[in-house]
Amino acid sequence: MRFKTKGRTLLDLKIKKAHIPKSFVFTIKQFRNNPKLIIKKIQKKFTKEIIVRSSAVNEDGNKKSFAGFFDSVLNLNSQSFSDVFNAVNKVESSYKKHYSNKNEILIQDMLIDVNISGVITTCDLKNYSPYYVINFTKENDTTVVTSGKKNSENL
């Protein structure tokens, strides 16, 4: 199975009727070549607060997962050029030694009033048994599971 970036996978899921927030994906190379154009597209597509998320080529794979490893920037004014520009740079710099021009940035509407959020894996990370594990929280903070700042629940 060939894994795609987080952004591309979410776009595919949206096509198949999953409820995915409005999304926009672009490569680091596209942003470096014309940041003004990319930010203009973001400002046209999004009118509310956004989240700038990582979508690295090696974030999800058969052998390794970097879920929660890279930065996200939450609660940004989509119409602020400098806020969006700085957030993209922060996420890009979190790629560090995993840097590639093919790495992407994922922009989404910022979710509010979240009832439950979490991460699903296809193996138990403690003993690598091959079954689905869902780590989740019922808190409104969507960063609880990936940040590790509090214990989440497992299913």
Q: Which ranges hold each PLM region?
A:
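Nucleotide/phosphate-binding sheet-loop regions of phosphoryl- and nucleotidyl-transfer enzymes
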Residues: 1-155
